[in-house]
Amino acid sequence: MIVAGQRLPILIATRPVDFRCGHQALALMVQTELKLDPHSGVTVVFRSKRGDRVKILVWDGTGMVLIYKVLEQGSFAWPRVQDGTMRLSRGQFEALFEGLDWRRVMAQRVPPPTAAG
């Protein structure tokens, strides 16, 4: 499952997909079109053409997890449609999943300290 502190990337597949696809077809898309290993633990967010639905695919170490969410009103905020993926931070992913405009969520990056204490 998607857990806090997850180090593996969370990616949006920017091109809409056919939402009749299940976990096997989406995993095949990850492998053939996005050139990623769907069993690596990477989280991939897929969008519908209407923009009000997402499917989230992730391998949790024991099996493929497919989450399907439909907004009752409105649509999700999406990047421009193009080939490929776009990386999301954990905070951006959580905002997207809540139906918020994740593009406004910017984490402050702080370099790690060089020494403890």
Residue spans of the language-model regions?
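Polybasic/polar functional segments that serve as interface/processing modules
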Residues: 1-117
